[in-house]
């Protein structure tokens, strides 16, 4: 990882349909930051993460990665980014092994088959690696998606509800992984409906930036 990376959010506003969700949202993140985006349902947490990941456009404002607008450095930005959304984002026609191999070869990842075997064991898919993803349960498909976390060397992780359908021990394991990512100089941004058991976490509440009619 680069010694210092910075994600700068400058006066973002977000609109969904006819509704403005938030306005004038600004903050800076740098290597070592571990942040939870908090707020009630419908306030715009997922919309914000999609904007930060370059998958949606803000109503106004800029997102910069290492001082450059992400729209102008897409190739570099996507190489440096691991984004996990609500959906597993895997290829249903590929096996668990093939999905991880595809991701490993295409992304900013640790290389080698031994890495994949270790990760499959870690997420409980060893023995199911040759099953086509479409034949696996929704929970098992999510494990394929989460397995990318142990493979990725991307410095920026943006994760939408990574703890959904994960038991208490799994939450603890994932939280430890997120802390390690930050300690290594990465940046982790996530949303969660449950408490994140980490003293290293910084919380940003979107309610502070909620649009009101008298603004």
Swiss-Prot record:
Keyword Translocase tagged: yes
SUPFAM superfamilies named in the record: P-loop containing nucleoside triphosphate hydrolases
Location relative to the cell: Cell inner membrane
Enzyme class: translocase
Keywords: ATP-binding, Cell inner membrane, Cell membrane, Cytochrome c-type biogenesis, Membrane, Nucleotide-binding, Translocase, Transport
Endpoints of the signal sequence: none
Residue spans crossing the bilayer: none
Membrane topology: Peripheral membrane protein
Residue span, ABC transporter domain: 7-209
Residues the entry annotates as binding ATP: 39-46
The protein's Enzyme Commission number: 7.6.2.5
Domain of life: Bacteria
Catalytic reaction equation(s): heme b(in) + ATP + H2O = heme b(out) + ADP + phosphate + H(+)
GO MF term set: ABC-type heme transporter activity; ATP binding; ATP hydrolysis activity
A GO BP entry: cytochrome complex assembly
Pfam family, one: ABC_tran
GO cellular component, as recorded: plasma membrane
Role: Part of the ABC transporter complex CcmAB involved in the biogenesis of c-type cytochromes; once thought to export heme, this seems not to be the case, but its exact role is uncertain. Responsible for energy coupling to the transport system.
Family membership: Belongs to the ABC transporter superfamily. CcmA exporter (TC 3.A.1.107) family.
Known partners and oligomeric status: The complex is composed of two ATP-binding proteins (CcmA) and two transmembrane proteins (CcmB).
Protein's name in the database: Cytochrome c biogenesis ATP-binding export protein CcmA
Native source species: Mannheimia succiniciproducens (strain KCTC 0769BP / MBEL55E)
């Amino acid at each position: 990882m680069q010694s210092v990376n910075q994600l700068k959010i400058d006066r973002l506003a977000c609109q969904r349909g006819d509704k403005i969700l938030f306005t004038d949202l600004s903050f800076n993140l740098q290597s070592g930051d571990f942040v939870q985006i908090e707020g009630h349902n419908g306030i715009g947490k997922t919309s914000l993460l999609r904007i930060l990941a370059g998958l949606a456009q803000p109503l106004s404002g800029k997102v910069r990665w290492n001082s450059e607008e992400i729209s102008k450095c897409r190739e570099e930005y996507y190489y440096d980014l691991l984004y996990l959304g609500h959906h597993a984002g895997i290829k249903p026609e590929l096996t668990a092994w093939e999905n991880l191999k595809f991701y490993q070869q295409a992304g900013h990842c640790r290389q080698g088959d031994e890495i994949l075997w270790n990760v499959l064991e870690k997420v409980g898919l060893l023995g199911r690696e040759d099953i086509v993803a479409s034949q696996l349960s929704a929970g098992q498909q999510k494990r394929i998606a989460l397995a990318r976390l142990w493979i990725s060397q991307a410095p920026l992780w943006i994760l939408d509800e990574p703890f959904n359908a994960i038991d208490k021990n799994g939450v603890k394991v994932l939280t430890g992984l997120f802390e390690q990512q930050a300690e290594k100089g990465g940046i982790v941004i996530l949303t969660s409906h449950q408490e994140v058991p980490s003293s290293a976490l910084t919380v940003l509440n979107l309610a502070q930036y909620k649009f009101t009619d008298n603004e």
